[in-house]
């Protein structure tokens, strides 16, 4: 009988390996922010990246992956996924494929990766073999604009300029005054900010104004930022949402505007924006795999747009601005509690 005990023990151990472990299951949460971040984490390819598919071919989507890093940092959850994402972004071929190489150099990607690296406490002077800070500063023109160096044209805009200021403000040298002045100088007469520089007439844009006001708040230009926030509040829909022009409100614009309003102390409007984002979120009546995701618009969940919508919605749900993102938090990918 005693000789059989090791055999029985071995069989029991083997069976234990076949039983699913509940320890690795995603925890449940009642937090809408955490549920959105958890859903976003589970959409990552191999738990580390996003891809864009064109013509049946998958290409790396560094921009959306960086957005996910920002979302996880804002929610203070899914940090293990943020760690894997930043490691993927720091692969040399992924970094240079985004910021440019061989004479091509892009302001927006440099700024976005620099911000992501700093949020995750990585060395930006050697990220994927690239000095992101030096590379970005090399794109600063005499006017104060950070411009692309490319044979395909200059696609820098209010987004890229704002990201540059937000990223450089975290560095030892800070954001160049000329770059801040340039951005302030693009303000439209109504107080908002346009996406495209130098366009006539000057047309204020929700997404751009949300980004610019955060950059100006971070760099000490509070009066100009507050003027932009006043314009944002003036174009907020009654349901709390924000849209592009006269289009219906959407999660992306509302997420960006919401975080800007929180950062600027416009709490009444910010909470209205958060309420709209919650109304777009898949709740317990939805398919289990979709719960926590944020739909792009009120028309409902669409997997083609939900990933990017959720990434930016998390910013508005959390109320944490880009200037205050900090890596860390819980490692898990929580699911919405429905019991």
Each model region followed by its residue ranges:
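An alpha-helical repeat/solenoid feature that recognizes helix-turn-helix modules
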Residues: 26-33, 50-81, 98-129, 146-178, ...
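Buried hydrophobic core positions in alpha-solenoid tandem helical repeats
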Residues: 40, 89-90, 136, 183, ...
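Primary recognition of N-terminal secretory signal peptides and signal-anchoring hydrophobic helices
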Residues: 29-46
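Secretory targeting and sorting signals
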Residues: 1-25
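Short, charged, amphipathic alpha-helices and their helix-cap/turn boundaries
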Residues: 129-142, 177-187, 227-234
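N-terminal low-complexity, Pro/Thr-rich disordered segments
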Residues: 20-29, 328-339
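Alpha-helical repeat scaffolds
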Residues: 82-91, 126-137, 271
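Intrinsically disordered, low-complexity N-terminal segments that are enriched in acidic
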Residues: 88, 92-100
